[in-house]
């Protein structure tokens, strides 16, 4: 159960640490470093009111390096009406004319969430509460190996303690203490004109993670994560209209514990916030229309489909989960093209309202 919260937290962490970065697929412009302090307020059905803040600084490691995007270091924290909290520090460095990309993040959290359990004797199920306390460290290094292709190792160290609302849910005790350490590699093909807010190009990412006892993990399985993002500029005159497409799959294989499953929601398919749909494999398709309609103001409209299954062959007979919605944007830090905004999405029997920093489809 704790993996659902951990995945949501790692997703948020991943989105934050890439803010404001730009690839060198097109001729770069010199930009001044910038400091951003962005407050956050949000609401969803499981956490109630959420408040927080992001403090981040953008800078050049080498002022003579006009090719590397701005490096980024910051802090993020949040607290919710359900007494959940999360805090972490992060850095992402672009080194030696963008030949090296290094990122690191460390954080702690205490999340009160829920999971959905079907009743075999009935046609419906029930939600049950649980609490996860966790500390984590994420490291990643990539080297440019050909054109816009990057390759390198990645590792995560996670220790968590989960307390369930009633005994026996974990299969053993009402409290589960576990380590979900992993090591792997990541391959990226990035031709976008801007990482944070692209108008054209492609971002293809493949990550393979191995959970092993020699890494200190309590579980032995593999995870394969693929995300394909494509961006099209719809206007020849300017960059005010963009169409973004995204396809993902998140597959866990082997002796996958319940904690290793993926929850439907987040940027991959907006409109879901209750944690009802989860499985070993989650596949998504999504499209988003972006329109910068007035100076620093913009809007988005999005629609997508998701499927949560035990194996790929189950997709034809599984429930297809739609998600549609729209959002408003404001360019908070023009020098780094960072937008803030709010997205409202509707899914199957669920909805989500999300305050966001940066655009979707950035990982």
For each feature predicted by the language model, list its residue ranges.
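Bacterial Sec-dependent N-terminal signal peptides
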Residues: 1-25, 232
């Amino acid at each position: 159960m704790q993996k659902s919260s951990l995945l949501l937290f790692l997703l948020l962490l991943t989105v934050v640490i890439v803010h404001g970065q730009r690839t060198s697929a097109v001729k770069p412009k010199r930009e001044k470093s910038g400091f951003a302090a962005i407050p956050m307020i949000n609401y969803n059905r499981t956490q109630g009111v959420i408040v927080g803040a992001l403090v981040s600084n953008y800078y050049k490691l080498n002022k003579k390096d006009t090719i590397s995007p701005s490096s980024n270091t910051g802090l993020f924290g949040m607290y919710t009406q359900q007494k959940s909290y999360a805090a972490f520090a992060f850095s992402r460095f672009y080194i030696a004319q963008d030949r090296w990309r290094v990122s690191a993040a460390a954080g702690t959290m205490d999340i009160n969430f829920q999971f959905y359990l079907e009743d075999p004797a009935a046609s419906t199920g029930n939600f049950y509460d649980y609490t996860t306390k966790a500390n984590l460290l994420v490291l990643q290094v990539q080297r440019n190996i050909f054109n816009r292709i990057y390759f390198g190792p990645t590792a995560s160290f996670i220790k968590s303690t989960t307390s369930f609302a009633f005994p026996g849910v974990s299969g053993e005790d009402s409290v589960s203490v576990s380590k979900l350490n992993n090591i792997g590699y990541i391959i990226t093909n990035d031709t976008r004109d801007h990482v944070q807010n692209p108008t054209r190009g492609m971002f293809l990412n493949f990550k393979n993670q191995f959970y092993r006892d020699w890494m200190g993990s309590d579980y032995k399985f593999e995870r394969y994560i693929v995300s394909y993002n494509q961006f099209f500029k719809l206007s020849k005159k300017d960059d005010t209209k963009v169409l973004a497409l995204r396809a993902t799959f998140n597959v866990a294989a082997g002796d996958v514990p319940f904690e290793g499953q993926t929850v439907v929601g987040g940027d991959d398919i907006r409109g879901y916030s209750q944690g009802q749909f989860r499985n070993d494999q989650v596949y998504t398709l999504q499209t988003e229309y972006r329109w910068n309609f007035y100076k620093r103001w913009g809007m988005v409209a999005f629609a997508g489909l998701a499927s949560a299954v035990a194996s790929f062959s189950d997709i034809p007979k599984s429930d297809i989960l739609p998600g549609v919605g729209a959002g408003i944007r404001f360019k908070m830090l023009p020098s780094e093209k960072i937008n803030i905004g709010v997205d409202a999405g509707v899914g199957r029997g669920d909805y989500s309202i999300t305050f966001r920093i940066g655009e979707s489809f950035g990982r």
